[in-house]
Amino acid sequence: MDGPTRGHGLRKKRRSRSQRDRERRSRGGLGAGAAGGGGAGRTRALSLASSSGSDKEDNGKPPSSAPSRPRPPRRKRRESTSAEEDIIDGFAMTSFVTFEALEKDVALKPQERVEKRQTPLTKKKREALTNGLSFHSKKSRLSHPHHYSSDRENDRNLCQHLGKRKKMPKALRQLKPGQNSCRDSDSESASGESKGFHRSSSRERLSDSSAPSSLGTGYFCDSDSDQEEKASDASSEKLFNTVIVNKDPELGVGTLPEHDSQDAGPIVPKISGLERSQEKSQDCCKEPIFEPVVLKDPCPQVAQPIPQPQTEPQLRAPSPDPDLVQRTEAPPQPPPLSTQPPQGPPEAQLQPAPQPQVQRPPRPQSPTQLLHQNLPPVQAHPSAQSLSQPLSAYNSSSLSLNSLSSSRSSTPAKTQPAPPHISHHPSASPFPLSLPNHSPLHSFTPTLQPPAHSHHPNMFAPPTALPPPPPLTSGSLQVAGHPAGSTYSEQDILRQELNTRFLASQSADRGASLGPPPYLRTEFHQHQHQHQHTHQHTHQHTFTPFPHAIPPTAIMPTPAPPMFDKYPTKVDPFYRHSLFHSYPPAVSGIPPMIPPTGPFGSLQGAFQPKTSNPIDVAARPGTVPHTLLQKDPRLTDPFRPMLRKPGKWCAMHVHIAWQIYHHQQKVKKQMQSDPHKLDFGLKPEFLSRPPGPSLFGAIHHPHDLARPSTLFSAAGAAHPTGTPFGPPPHHSNFLNPAAHLEPFNRPSTFTGLAAVGGNAFGGLGNPSVTPNSMFGHKDGPSVQNFSNPHEPWNRLHRTPPSFPTPPPWLKPGELERSASAAAHDRDRDVDKRDSSVSKDDKERESVEKRHSSHPSPAPVLPVNALGHTRSSTEQIRAHLNTEAREKDKPKERERDHSESRKDLAADEHKAKEGHLPEKDGHGHEGRAAGEEAKQLARVPSPYVRTPVVESARPNSTSSREAEPRKGEPAYENPKKSSEVKVKEERKEDHDLPPEAPQTHRASEPPPPNSSSSVHPGPLASMPMTVGVTGIHPMNSISSLDRTRMMTPFMGISPLPGGERFPYPSFHWDPIRDPLRDPYRELDIHRRDPLGRDFLLRNDPLHRLSTPRLYEADRSFRDREPHDYSHHHHHHHHPLSVDPRREHERGGHLDERERLHMLREDYEHTRLHSVHPASLDGHLPHPSLITPGLPSMHYPRISPTAGNQNGLLNKTPPTAALSAPPPLISTLGGRPVSPRRTTPLSAEIRERPPSHTLKDIEAR
């Protein structure tokens, strides 16, 4: 056989097999094949083979022509590899172009078949039409296939046409009689039955990377349908057995398939494809042209021939690189696919269209088919053995099929000749055999040591490792083929089991399967079929639950249910929420979250990683992997049971830990209504710890969610059972401290956040929106209210716990606000600097209101936080009054400041905004630190965040504005903070999320709050949030407020949007101009005296939507009006005076008024009834975030600053401080970014885009 010359290493095997085939052909009817003698003889053989394919259709022509046709095509391939490629292109084009023509060819088949046989040389003439030829030559071929100059092209064209004609009848038969067999026919039942069949065959080849080619449509389809699979498999196996038995005499194969082609329409194509694939493998170079026809005849054969012509010629050159050749040629073939569709729509449909189909149904079915093929392979075991003889041919054919598959699945496997499955498809049935029988030959070898895959191991790491066994492929494959017999019973069982699973899972995951097809195709092609099966099984078990992991879904949809049935049931509350929580919420971001679910990814990861699976498969004995993988449950059992045990233990442990923790928190809360430190300290341990055991706080939260009443009642009222316990609010604060204690554990302990949320929610979150809620939070009545909303929301989103976190901030904020109310009056009376201090206090209060979800105050000033919580209602009311008064004064003051400092601060602030310049930054930071120190002294509670807010704000605006003021006396003290702030601010600018926390950390003893701020509240609370959270960070806090305001409807959105900042997910355009501008209003109030004045002047927005928030803003302005006025007047005054700014103000004001109207509705609803949901809305992001992503876990806390606090344990107060910003955010829906680090002009510019300020601040 010519194969030896073509493929040296691999080809040698083919040589032996091809020699065997030659013997068979000599026995069966070599004369017919030899009639072609030389290249012409080969062409003739090809044409004869093609015609024999046509004869199959009409009258099985001498099988000898079939055997002879394979050999001559191989020689032809050798003769002209490039021509083959061209022919392949032309061939593909011809097939596609002449899809209609192919139908015509079906009519013309007998005559044209004869003509083609008669004039194979004339067919060569068509070579000139290699690419364009297919289109023109379609009919030309039909009438004069000889016109092509290249024998290969001629043969290929003839084969294509004949194959089309034959294939069309076969396809029609398969489609009609074997629609069950022909998955493609199912997909494209008979849109042009031949066309549908071509596609189906191509798709089958592709999707059935295992047994598409020779097994072709019939067998592939058989794989698709279990019963029919078995029936078709039986018949195809009979055909294969007969054909393979006759394969030794190629004539027998040809005859049997040809006759069977007519007799067993769907099955014969399999045999035809299998036999031809084998024969083609043997006569890769000669038969490539014919092979395409054959592949097209029995869809699989068409796929094989097409690649083989290219691959085979290349295979000749590099036997070890057949895969590379295939890859190389596969890309050319894909181009032909591309070329063919344009030139030959029918052919293109045949190949590219089949690809889509292959991707569509084949993926879903490819698992079933793979499974089915796993079973039938034994049936086709004789074929597998026979194939093992021509394994070299198979390798060649497989490689060629790889090329073809690559071309066919050029999308997924262009460069991957990954269709080694298809290459093993040469006997599609054998490929299913390949799993059991061919598995040894092609599937095992493909999977563990893919002969073709070994060539393109590059495509996959496992294949790379697998390539070495190609020799095993020929020798071991045969042996494996025999073991396949023993495996067959197992595989038959597996086939039934897996087919059942696949059918069940595919029915459910058909859509998901469609998604995975490319992935599966790659996997199939890369990890030979066995690997695919392993992955399928593994993935089925592992990924079925995750629609987002659709590729695995298609592969492992079925096993996954058991895994989750076993796993979720055990860890139901825990993991279901972690995995399913993110997943059940059905949030758009969940699918990613689920894969991110590292723990489960790891659980599944044992088999999930394609590389890991291949490694597992490769590491395991060739057959074992199939057994293990096929019995994926077993594999999962070793891994999953352990995981399940830990998971179950984790779930139980976390649950118990949470219960204990809740109980302790209750006790502590009861014991220390004021001392949040103790509770938060405990809470971090329990909350952080249990979350640690759990995959994430998400899991714990899921746990809490699992016991949503407790968790979300706890989140709402007391963390354990928030409603009943007063401590939960403190726990909420504690949770925030816990959050800052353990950033991730914190996030993990979103339950803690839930408790914090209950605290923040009942006491702070709601109070931030509604003082009563704050009070209720403290008392626990609000908590119950929150619990009710939390339970619905928390179960769904688990974010409520984090949203409840804000209320605790309100608690401390309230104390501080009462103090701040006096401080505001006092500061108003006092110098503007004092006013800034009081503003800082009020800012803290407002920030706490905004960041009420953040338990941060607890870490810094837990007692104060409690005290604040106690007096939060009174303080809020006084603060509101004070802020109402201060709204005007700060406005004017800030106006004055902005105008007076406009020139000075405009440049300084701009420069600082550019990169937090420390020249003014230090002065401002010093002042801010001084104010912070004063504020901290006054309100030792979480208001540390106020400094943080100021420092963050100074980072954006306040820090810089307040820094000059504060910097004078307090600069020395706060310089540390200021410097740290500067660092943090820079980080703010660079790491939007981190910087805010860092700034907060710098300004505050607990940076975690800052971090929390960065993620959730602090961003909004902090000016940094303005810059950092421009979209997300700002959105975090704004989102907090937004969540509170719009949480009910935004609660879900935050999760998807909120990476770490669930709020950003509050992307309802509030983040942008509408809400964002309102948020910016608050931030502007804090940061931009003018902006604040502007926003506050828009009292309809502020007063109506968030009087509290606006008053908090006013307090911010009163506290930081100098800072803000200073800087903002410096660089904002231009805006305020700026017609641009005035215009923007007007536009934004209108927008904000509109938004505020919405917000008012939201506020009122949320304050009264929605607030719990709003808290939930807040939690949903984190909760949703927590389940899937750690960052999302943070977001859950992050909104609450719980996660942020967890990350930045020290900053939780800052986070809490930034927690109030949600209120501000509520008012200033704009993301924290509006908190201007940049001039108001920039802020205004950024307000609508929501990116400008972020970008500017980032700068």
Curated annotation (Swiss-Prot):
GO terms classed as biological process: actin cytoskeleton organization; axon extension; dendrite extension; neuron migration; positive regulation of lamellipodium assembly; positive regulation of Rac protein signal transduction; positive regulation of transcription by RNA polymerase II
Gene (name only): AUTS2
Expression sites by tissue: Strongly expressed in brain, skeletal muscle and kidney. Also expressed in placenta, lung and leukocytes.
Annotated compartments: Nucleus; Cytoplasm, Cytoskeleton; Cell projection, Growth cone
Polar residues bias locations: 177-192, 436-447
Keywords associated with the record: Autism, Autism spectrum disorder, Cell projection, Chromosomal rearrangement, Cytoplasm, Cytoskeleton, Intellectual disability, Nucleus, Phosphoprotein, Transcription, Transcription regulation
Primary location recorded for the protein, binned into one broad class: nucleus
Name of this chain's protein: Autism susceptibility gene 2 protein
Disordered: annotated span: 1-87, 108-285, 299-470, 771-1027, 1119-1146, 1217-1259
Bias (Gly residues): 28-41
Free-text domain note: The Pro-rich region is important for the interaction with RAC guanine nucleotide exchange factors and the subsequent activation of RAC1, which then promotes lamellipodia formation.
Extent of Pro residues compositional bias: 331-345, 353-365, 801-810
PANTHER family in the cross-refs: AUTISM SUSCEPTIBILITY GENE 2 PROTEIN, FIBROSIN FAMILY MEMBER
Span list, region Important for regulation of lamellipodia formation: 289-472
Biased composition (Low complexity): 386-410
